[in-house]
């Protein structure tokens, strides 16, 4: 039996209704209802981030690490409750792993060598605005880890969270933006 477009739409509507997804808030701490608005805000932020020193970016990352540790249990419980996947104890450990082991600016190094053919210099530079689709498994861990890496490199990011993990994802994004504001 061939599947028509209307059948696909009916299936999508049925699945979304079962998930009972609330509308996302708009514009507060980097949460937008429309993707284009999020992209425009990230472009504006990118103009600031790319001018930041490595020390400034590391200061934000340090604040993010602190906030992850302070909120690990809350995010773990939210993730398990919202998605029905995983267990709280393991997710708490994963959040601490993200806070303790995710590389920051220390991995952004300059390499240079010279020889008979001249000087070669390799320096890392930002890509700009990065788009990321996040999973329903480990939503907050993914957002937090990816942000620290992207920020270390001087980039900004727009996340499109999985609908089954929207509340947990919004919590993590708010936490990141609070850390950025608190760090100056």
Show the residue positions of the predicted features.
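Rossmann-like NAD(P) dinucleotide-binding subdomain of oxidoreductase/dehydrogenase enzymes
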Residues: 110-184
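N-terminal Rossmann-like NAD(P)+-binding subdomain of aldehyde/semialdehyde dehydrogenases
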Residues: 3-121
């Amino acid at each position: 039996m061939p599947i028509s477009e209307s059948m696909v739409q009916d299936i999508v509507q049925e699945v979304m209704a079962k998930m009972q997804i609330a509308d996302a808030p708009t514009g507060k701490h980097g949460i937008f209802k429309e993707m284009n608005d999020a992209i425009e805000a990230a472009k504006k932020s990118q103009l600031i981030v790319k001018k930041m020193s490595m020390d400034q970016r590391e200061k934000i990352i340090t604040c993010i690490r602190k906030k992850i540790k302070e909120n690990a249990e809350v995010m773990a419980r939210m993730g398990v409750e919202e998605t029905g996947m995983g267990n709280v104890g393991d997710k708490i450990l994963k959040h601490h792993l993200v806070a303790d082991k995710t590389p920051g600016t220390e991995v952004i190094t300059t390499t240079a060598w010279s020889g008979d053919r001249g000087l070669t210099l390799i320096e890392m530079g930002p890509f700009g605005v990065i788009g990321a689709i996040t999973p329903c498994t480990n939503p907050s861990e993914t957002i937090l880890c990816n942000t620290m890496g992207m920020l270390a490199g001087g980039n900004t990011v727009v996340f499109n969270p999985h609908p089954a993990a929207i509340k947990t994802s919004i919590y993590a994004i708010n936490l990141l933006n609070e850390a950025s504001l608190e760090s100056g």
